[in-house]
Structure formats: C-alpha cells, structure tokens
Amino acid sequence: MQSIPKGMKAHIGIFGKRNVGKSSILNALTKQDISIVSETAGTTTDPVEKSMELLPLGPVLFVDTAGIDDEGALGLQRVEKTKKVIDRIDLAIIVADFNGFDKFEELLIKEFETRKTPFIIVVNKIDELYPSPLEGEGIFQHESKARVLEKLGEGSLAQLQEYEVDIVYTSALLKKGIDDLKQAIIKNVPESFFSETSIASDLIKAGEVAVLVVPIDLEAPKGRLILPQVQTIRDLLNNDSIVMVTKERELKKTLDNLKTPPALVITDSQAFLKVSADVPRNIKLTSFSILFARFKGELNEFVKGTLAIEDLKSGDKILICESCTHHAIGDDIGRVKIPRWITQYTGKKLEFEHYAGHDFPPNIKDYALIIHCGACMTNRREILSRILKAKEANVPMTNYGLTIAYSLGIFERALEPFEGAKLIYDELTK
C-alpha cells in the first residue's frame, strides 16, 4: 500500500490518428522511452499506461492509445480498445500534425463533448515545418502558430480554434513545446484533483469516534486490509477523527467498552445484518461500499436505481460489474451472496451476468438492473461514464452496498448519514 492507488490518479489519454507522434509525446512528457516509436503506422496496439508526478497536480496516469484511424480486422479491434479508454479519462490530449483535422479528430471531439471531458489539441511535428526552431518556449509557440498558419491557411487554423480549447504546438522529436503542454495539462485537469475529496470525514466532526468493522474472510488479502478500508482510515485521520477497527464478532464488546458512543459505524456490507443488530439505533451506520457509491459514483442516482429492485420480474437479467479481476472462492459477494439475497428478497427467478475490469457490455438495454462494486480499483470517471450509458439506455444502476442493505431490509438506516440521499429516498417512497 506504499503507492497511490491508480484509481486516485488523474487519467490523461493521448489520442489521434496513426503516425502523428502520440507515443513520442508520451515519451517526451515522461522523459522515458515508454512507448515504441516507429515510422510504421499502427505501432501502438494495446493502450500503454505510465504514471508520473506532475507538480503541482501530483500523480497522474498517462494512457497512450492506438490510432483512431486504424484499419483491417485487427485495426478495428485496436480502435475498440481506444474507445474503451475514452470512458475512463479525466483529460484528453488530441494529437494531430500540421496537416490539420479531419473526420477522425472530429469524432474524438464529439465523444469528449458528450462526456463533458476536457481536452487539449496538440499540433505535433512542427520540426518538419522548420528544422531549427527558435529557442524559448514562448517564442516557439508564437513562431509555430505562424508557420502552421502559413502552411494551412486561415481556414484550417480557424477550424482548430473554433473549439475554444488550448492549442499547443510541439516537436516531440526536438522536445520543443513539451513544457507548454505540461502547463496546459495542469490548467485543464478537473479542479477536483487539486483538492481532497472526502470519503467519510465530512460525516463526523474532528475528535469524534468512528468504528470500522472489517471481517476477515477467505477472500481477505493476507497481511493487510483491503483498499477501501485503508483509504477510509486515512481520510478520517486527515480530519483528526478517532478511528477504531474491529471484526464483526468483537463489535458488541468494542461498543460496550466505549465511554462515549461512536458518531459513526462503517461496516463491510457483507456483515450488514449482524452489525445492524449489534449497533444501537441511535448510532449512525453505513458501509464502505455505500461510502464509495458517493466517492466514485453518484450516490443519489444509485439510490434511485436501488428502488428498481421492487420492479424485478422473473426472467429479468441483472448485470453485476466488478472493477478488479479476482479468483472467486467460497461465498463470493458478487457471484454468490448478492444473487442469493436479491432472489430471496424478490422471490423471482432472475438471471445474473458478470463483467470484470474495464469490460462493459455494448448493449445494456437487455438488463433490468446494473449492480456495480464499490469501484475502489478504478477511477471515478469510468464509473460516471457507465452511469451515463445506463441513463441513456434507461437502465437503473446501483452498487453492492446499497443492494445488500435494501435486500436485507436496512436500506433506510444505511442512508441516514447522507442527508441528501435520504431525502431523495423519502420523497420517492412516501
């Protein structure tokens, strides 16, 4: 747990046609030979990822992609992988050369605008317009714009400028314009990456006690806590809260030994029923998964989606998504427990399908409900992209913790720490 989780880093995607210098831009940004560079079109096949520190922004993850204009059977598969990357990036870099834009770049821009993803335009290979660029980044940008204008004419440059985004001129070969590109990245990354987003620390005051319930089951990793637990502990400590950690079997004794009741109890969703019975009704209770429904997704939308459980009919298909890939053993939460609890609650004969990692079915209209994990291993943008797709397909979406709480009859209590979500629930059920 020494490194910052990948899901917490700003994801910056590098897109464009083949042979415009996308991989060279990545190598220049990171000052490493991360991606293979070749004159052969289509050198980059699978997305290439590289983390680096970009101050004052902090840790970022660059993703180099295959050319959006790739051809042939394999080429089309590479394009599909590139499109999947679009779903999880927080900022896009569109790389073109001095020949300007065509339908491929316009397609990318349309995708980014639909997702409200900020983007930067990079005009690369300026060295081919003048082999000995003037020194100084400011001079280089001014002179490069003049050379491109001379080459393309007013119309083509106006086409780039009409998008009202930052345009950066670069020569990845000569490492020119790269500092300007870094500054443009820092300027355009969503503001949320410059501030701390709370997981649980806004739910209690500094100095108050939070009790975290962490079952140790067969799927628990050896020698450490799982990522959502670690992140929640750190978030609470940052707020000067007092954190106590216990297993579900020792919870009642832990509470009895406290002189002052805790302000909040947070449990693994799988232990919801026992923990709810052991925690007095005057103490607020929720789960790690519900905290992450807010942290990585949209809690209010997930609350609405959870209520769709009431409308399930026999034969309905339910999609269960997990951000990570793991070997399921025993009573796996996604493959065994959640299907069992929903089936018991509804009394219906339902079909369950599972997807893991970045895979997401292209046609989700076939599903009556989507249930997502807490998404601790992916970034928020990818979850928001999936929420958008679910809305467009008119398919309700929720997550593990909310589904479990609803199926076990403790949904209302689990929402009490979140005033806005609880208000939505009350309005929808009155």
Task: Locate the predicted segments by residue.
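Conserved G1/Walker A P-loop phosphate-binding module
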Residues: 1-76, 84-85
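Short, charged N-terminal beta->alpha structural module
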Residues: 24, 28, 212, 219-235, ...
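G-domain G4 guanine-recognition motif of GTPases
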Residues: 65, 96-99, 120-131, 168-176, ...
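Conserved Switch II/interswitch segment of TRAFAC-class P-loop GTPases
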Residues: 70, 86-107, 116-130
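An anion/phosphate-binding loop that grips the pyrophosphate of nucleotide cofactors and donors
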Residues: 89, 262, 367
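Canonical P-loop GTPase G-domain recognition
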Residues: 118-120, 125-133, 139-198, 202, ...
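Redox- and metal-dependent alpha/beta enzyme cores, enriched for Fe-S-associated oxidoreductases
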Residues: 294-347, 353-359, 364
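C-terminal functional extensions of proteins
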Residues: 314, 337, 345, 362, ...
